[in-house]
A protein has these predicted regions:
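Extracellular/virion structural assembly segments
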Residues: 1-132
Length: 132
C-alpha cells in the first residue's frame, strides 16, 4: 500500500496490513425523507459522487510505521485542501486506487508508540490510524 502526494509526486509506503475498517459501512445512495403539507411522503434520493470515508487502522501487533513516516504523514495532513494541494493517491496492494484527502473535520492521524514510551529515534515504531 502506498500514499502519494499528488502535488509533489512523493510516495510514502504504508504497511499492507492496515485494515480499512469502514470499507463496507458506506453506501453511494443517499436519501432524505420529509412530509409535505398534504401529508404525503416526499423522498429525494441521489448517488454520491465523492466523499467515501476511508479509515485505515493498524492492529496492536502489526501495521507498525516508523516515527519518520508518522512525521511525514502529519506534515501532509497539515496541508489544507486547495486547488492542487491536499490531495493524495492511495493505492491498495490489490490494485484499487482512490484519490483522498485527510479528514480535517476529525482527527486525521493517530499515532501511538509501540513500546508505550516516548519515541526518540526516527526508526522507533508507532501504531497508526489514518482517516481520509
Amino acid at each position: 500500500m502506498q500514499l502519494k502526494n499528488l502535488d509533489t509526486g512523493v510516495a510514502l509506503p504504508l504497511p499492507d496490513d492496515l485494515l480499512w475498517s469502514d470499507e463496507h459501512a458506506w453506501s453511494p445512495a443517499v436519501a432524505n425523507a420529509s412530509y409535505l403539507i398534504t401529508g404525503s411522503l416526499l423522498i429525494q434520493s441521489a448517488t454520491r459522487k465523492s466523499g467515501r470515508p476511508i479509515t485505515l487502522v493498524g492492529a496492536p501487533d502489526m501495521a507498525w510505521v516508523t516515527r519518520a513516516a508518522v512525521e511525514q504523514l502529519r506534515a501532509w495532513a497539515a496541508i489544507p485542501v486547495g486547488g492542487s494541494t491536499g490531495r493524495f493517491e492511495l493505492t491498495f496492494t490489490d490494485g484499487r486506487v482512490f484519490t483522498v484527502a485527510f479528514r480535517h473535520q476529525e482527527v486525521a492521524i493517530e499515532a501511538e508508540p509501540v513500546l508505550g514510551i516516548p519515541a526518540r529515534s526516527g526508526n522507533d515504531f508507532y501504531r497508526l490510524t489514518l482517516r481520509f
